[in-house]
Amino acid sequence: MLITRIIKREKSSKYDVFIDGEYAFTCDAETFFMLGIEEGKEITSEQYKYYVNYIEAKEAKNHAFRLLSRKMLTEKQLADKLKLKGFSEEAIGEAVSKAKEYDYVNDENYAKFFVEEKMQSLYSRRRIYYELLKRGVEKEIIEKVLESIYPHEKEVEVIRQIVEKKKNSHREIQKLKKYLYTNGFEIENIEKALNLT
């Protein structure tokens, strides 16, 4: 395999590389010089695969860091977004590992932030639990974070806040019980909160 042509893009630090007369890949200037790519250079198919895998892994990492600079994500959410972008499993694995290494992705920190935020929005423990499960956070992490930040006693307080907003009559109380139960609050906590108000 022969690198037959290299075109530097205008107004960009990217290079288009052609092998045996056909377009092969695009890379940035840093990668271009680091890999020692030059016109007329003979490369093996193993070198070609290495170049392509290296470039894809670097692009996946860069994309992951851009995503994480805008929004906190779980490992699963990050991997899913990279998969949607078309990156290979290997490149996704490298990107997620690098993000974890720099502590840009940390499911426990994500869970703590999520629980704090949703508690303020008067979510039940159960609803938060299932929302975090959907986002790929492990059960053990969710349980640990819920116990430390949102114990059952706090859920009773949250129920009281909801009750204060909605209670007027017996009929309203019954509707409220049903509302609270369908939103994931435990029946024992509902009864406690209603008896204490």
From Swiss-Prot:
Instruction: List the subcellular locations.
Output: Cytoplasm
The biological processes this protein is annotated with in GO are: regulation of DNA repair
* Superkingdom of origin organism: Bacteria
- As recorded in UniProt, coiled-coil segments are none
Keywords in UniProt for this one?
Answer: Cytoplasm
This protein's GO CC annotations: cytoplasm
Query: What protein family is recorded?
Result: Belongs to the RecX family.
Known function? Modulates RecA activity.
The molecule here is called: Regulatory protein RecX
User: What is the protein's species of origin?
Assistant: Caldanaerobacter subterraneus subsp. tengcongensis (strain DSM 15242 / JCM 11007 / NBRC 100824 / MB4) (Thermoanaerobacter tengcongensis)
Q: Which gene encodes it?
A: recX
